[in-house]
């Protein structure tokens, strides 16, 4: 590593952010499988995109088709999966984007490690706190059935623990209220902390 030096770009994050009319951040959606992370993050991205903001959504399943296709589901591989995602998200934030990441990310240590890579205020933890009973009832991928039968081991919430955030910036239970109201709450929060400007957010339903 001694011969590797960080190359400073002629265009920095502040200039990219100014061009896009937004302050780049990473919104990290964490919660159990079936909690509604991807649905909520996807709906927020659609609303922001339609209002003219520059976004990208990193989804837990999607990154395993390419970036992390060589990884399994051991503790070590899960840690590496999130490490890679955190690094990619950091590059995207540096590019001036509002980045949304939807990952179970079950441990506080993992999430806090990613938070530590960002300046204060650029990592926004969104705890999708939908109860296990609701997630298991939804079971969109049939994973809980397999976990209960022993077909899947180390499944978060069943045979492996989920550590809920102690101080998430936002907490949303998708079993309460409708999706539009939940997205509106996220938009209002991003506006309040000056990630996005009010002129554009007036166009967001």
Curated annotation (Swiss-Prot):
Protein name: Adenylyl-sulfate kinase
GO molecular function: adenylylsulfate kinase activity; ATP binding
EC number: 2.7.1.25
Reaction equation(s) it catalyzes: adenosine 5'-phosphosulfate + ATP = 3'-phosphoadenylyl sulfate + ADP + H(+)
GN (gene name): cysC
Enzymatic class: transferase
Active site residues per record: 105
A Pfam family: APS_kinase
Pathways per UniProt: Sulfur metabolism; hydrogen sulfide biosynthesis; sulfite from sulfate: step 2/3
Transmembrane segments: none
GO BP annotation list: hydrogen sulfide biosynthetic process; sulfate assimilation
Function: Catalyzes the synthesis of activated sulfate.
Family statement: Belongs to the APS kinase family.
């Amino acid at each position: 590593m001694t011969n590797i030096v960080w190359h400073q770009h002629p265009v920095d994050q502040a200039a990219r952010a100014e061009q896009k009319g937004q302050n780049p951040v990473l919104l990290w959606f964490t919660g159990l499988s079936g909690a509604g992370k991807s649905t909520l993050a996807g709906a927020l991205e659609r609303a922001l995109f339609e209002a003219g903001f520059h976004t990208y959504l990193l989804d837990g399943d999607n990154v395993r088709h390419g970036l992390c296709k060589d990884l399994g589901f051991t503790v070590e591989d899960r840690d590496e999966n999130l490490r890679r995602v955190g690094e990619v998200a950091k590059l995207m934030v540096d590019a001036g984007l509002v980045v949304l990441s939807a990952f179970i990310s079950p441990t506080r240590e993992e999430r806090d490690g990613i938070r530590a890579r960002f300046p204060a205020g650029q990592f926004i933890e969104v705890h999708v706190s939908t109860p296990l009973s609701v997630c298991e009832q939804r079971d969109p991928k049939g994973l809980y059935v397999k976990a209960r039968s022993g077909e899947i081991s180390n499944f978060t919430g069943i045979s492996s623990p989920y550590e809920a955030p102690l101080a998430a910036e936002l907490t949303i239970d998708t079993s309460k209220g409708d999706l539009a109201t939940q997205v509106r709450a996220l938009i209002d929060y991003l506006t309040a902390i000056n990630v996005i400007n009010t002129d554009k957010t007036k166009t967001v339903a």
